[in-house]
Amino acid sequence: MSAKQTILISFALVAALCLASACSLKDDAAVESCAKSFGQNYFNLRLQQASGLCTDRSYKWIEFHASNISQGDVDVLNAQTDSALCDIDDIDIDGDSARVKMTVRNFLLCDSIGRPGRMCKQGKCRLTLRKEGETWKVDLDGLVTKTEE
């Protein structure tokens, strides 16, 4: 193999690695943006906006969550001076799916039937996202739940 061929092959490999890295960074940013927007809308009970960031099969879980929110829950949330905030802790992308670990602060925790929710200072949750075409969407297979404090 000549020096010229070696240089061309090396250049092609470096270019391929750069291209793959750029795609990965683009996906990371898109996953983070979708997950954070979903979390901020979901935990601030802007469920219509949250549903726009979900796969079609996730709508039933958004509707179920909405159907279980009482006026007492809304009153507790409206009494707060600060809204819920979400920070992304970790993203793991595997092809057209991604798993996100998120920290949520100052959110309404509704975990008891027949009793108004209560404010939670901080909790963690996990989301799964799927890539549909060029768009990342949250793919719920149940209610979004707090996994730990």
Task: Specify the residue positions occupied by each region the protein language model found.
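Exposed beta-sheet edge and beta->alpha loop/turn motif
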Residues: 93-149
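Sec-dependent bacterial lipoprotein signal peptides
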Residues: 1-21
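Short solvent-exposed beta->alpha transition segments
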Residues: 32, 47-95, 99, 105-108
